[in-house]
């Protein structure tokens, strides 16, 4: 009975997300030109989405992770974490605007501070449902489920940005999706992979198993810190040779690689 209740709640939240994420395209408010531009932009985004999904499921098969768990985690990132984060970010933005009106600091750093603290926990929320329905016993499986949720979130966020960019015209919309495709090399999928390993290791430490506590703190700090930097004015620094974004990207990828090495070495930690 408990498992059925969890499944129903999960399906309900996914259905809400599906309606929320698609209503703009089905309510008749878009013009023919906007539909065309939307189609072109999504087609471009598929050049990273399809390979990313292919490698995700190939690794899942290699690591013997149940395919249904991977699919549910991916859908959860798209249609559960996405709309919950959107609502949470909006409400927090409105609240901060009331508490600290005309704050130059918040204007510059609100997204950098709020987004990691809101989105990283919510991207892990689908895993709570997935693990309750399909328990896994390997740290690599947990790591990959986190990556899947982050990738799903990243994909739906990119589509959402296409939608909001449409009024700015063809040139702006295309340039923005190309920018997001390039930056996708180290985006939400890396943050979530780092975060899930960090949170699990800290949970183990809370339960009295101290092995990996230091690494857990480092991985979680990397997830939040790199997300902060990507949303901060730091990445807008202009130098003769591009440095800001490559530096943050390198930090994220290096941290992710270290998390992967830890997971490979300690795969049986969940047993």
Short names for language-model regions:
Residues 1-271:
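Hydrophobic alpha-helical segments at protein termini of multi-pass membrane proteins
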